[in-house]
Amino acid sequence: PGGSDGIFVFSAAAAGLAVGACVTVTGTAKEFNGLTELDKPTITPKADCAPVLPTALTTLPVSDADKEQYEGMLVAPQGTYTITNNYALNQFGQVGLAVGDQPLYQATDVVAPGAAAAEYEAENLKKYITLDDGSSWDYMRNTTAQGSPLPYLSQEEPMRTGSQVTFAKPVILDYRFQWNYQPTGQIVGATDADDPLTTENDREATPPAVGGNLKLAAFNVLNYFTELGEDEDEFKNCPYYADREGDPVTTNFCEVRGAWTDAAFEDQKAKLMSAVNGLGSSVVALMEIENSAGVTWVDRDRDYTLREFVDSLNAAGGHWAYVPSPVVTPATEDVIRTAFIYNPDLVRPVDTSYIQMDSAFANARYPLAQRWQAPKSSTQFVTVANHFKSKSSGDDDGTGQGLSNPSREAQAHALTSWTSQMWPAKPIFLMGDFNAYSKETPVSIIESAGFTELEKKYEPTSATYQFSGRLGSLDHVFANQSALSLVTGAGVWDINADESIAMQYSRRNYNVTDFYTTSQFASSDHDPVVVGLQVRVPSQK
């Protein structure tokens, strides 16, 4: 009682056995990286035996000790699971699952940093298990694996985080680096007979309905660079990430950060054109678009790539203009920047744009502000595009909010102080990638200055980003009290963060299955945030 009735047999001879074959196995049990197995066994065929029936798992065992009672056994997981991690699907054929009808969220997107966040994450861990593909293949490095279709994934079954699954077939509970459900055979492609899952396709064809007669959007476009890696390579060495045939696709820590070849750039562009034109927005704040003046090996003005972006959008059926950079710009800047594009039929810029050249943003992107007015409307409002310091480098303040959190706090203070001084009586929207989850201190600083975070107000469980099997919002739109009276709704268009990275242009031809399409899905790694506004026009009473 309390012991497992199954065990993994480590033997080359086992490869010739079919599921359901009867054998007698003798050997020495041992532990290998946490997995109990029989080593150097003797395997003898047997005439008959009792059938192996799966043991129902009505709930996922929580502790290691509880799971070990079922280790190596055929089990039938019951109820609903939700995909919460698909990042390793592209490399190891693995899907992270959470028990229940919700994915797992970043703790600091839900509760305050510190003890509450630690407690929240401890509960996350109790709900998590990986579904493996029945193999140890590395689809990024193993050439045989690259020539075999990725398991589980297709356009029809995109295996998005947040989508719900149930188990239609039994699996084996085992331990390899972490606790896993293993199918009873290797999964090859999306329609393998041993695939144990029933899945759903919950892709959203259109943005959320947010009402109003104007729409704002904030969108990180994932390093959109017209300057290519192959061009930089003519001036200085520019390493690249290659597909399965060794052909370059994207840059690898070069000065430019996007596509390496023109073909890859066209793939990237087509997806972004579908996404941005599909937003139907009046004003879009862009993050991670090339700052052409910051590329040292070409002589471009700051707006060169922004103009190209707008020209491409219009060639694809859009109707856009861009906000030119102001005359005075920072002396030194990052090679990526923020920008505004807009539909000139719906809204017009008032005066020039402004860049907040505060030293707090020296390690990030300087905020870009623009005042707007709709034709025939007396209402003016201000939007500020932001891209705070990332979590990937800098000092750790020990609060569990990622690296460089003090920098983001200083940026939040500087931003709110500047905007309140510049436009004390105007509706103000702070938009963009703040690199801070919804309960982290930079967000709290902005809210304490009188701003309301809109997507959580209207969609409390929304998320714009996926990292390490957890969902959360790094991208936000904040409204001050005056702006809040204009807002009719807000939401996240879930087209990117939930998608497998295999669907992105940057992974094209990494596998024999071509997952690339020109659709909006996986056009970036961040989801756009959309906000509806109602501004008065003369016909309204």
Describe the role of every protein-language-model region.
Residues 1-249, 356-366, 408, 413, ...:
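Extended non-catalytic accessory segments flanking core domains
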Residues 8-9, 25, 37, 75-77, ...:
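Structural recognition of the beta-strand scaffold that forms the well-ordered cores
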Residues 14-16, 30-33, 44-45, 82, ...:
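Solvent-exposed loop/turn segments at secondary-structure junctions
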Residues 22-24, 74, 78, 170, ...:
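Extracytoplasmic/secreted proteins, especially bacterial periplasmic and envelope-associated proteins
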Residues 25-34, 40-48, 80, 84, ...:
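Sec-exported extracytoplasmic/periplasmic mature domains
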Residues 152-157, 161-169, 173-181, 187-203, ...:
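Metal-dependent phosphoester-hydrolase catalytic domains
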Residues 190-338, 374, 396-416, 497-521, ...:
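N-terminal, active-site-proximal structural segment of metallo-dependent hydrolase catalytic domains
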Residues 379, 385-405:
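Active-site His/acidic residue clusters
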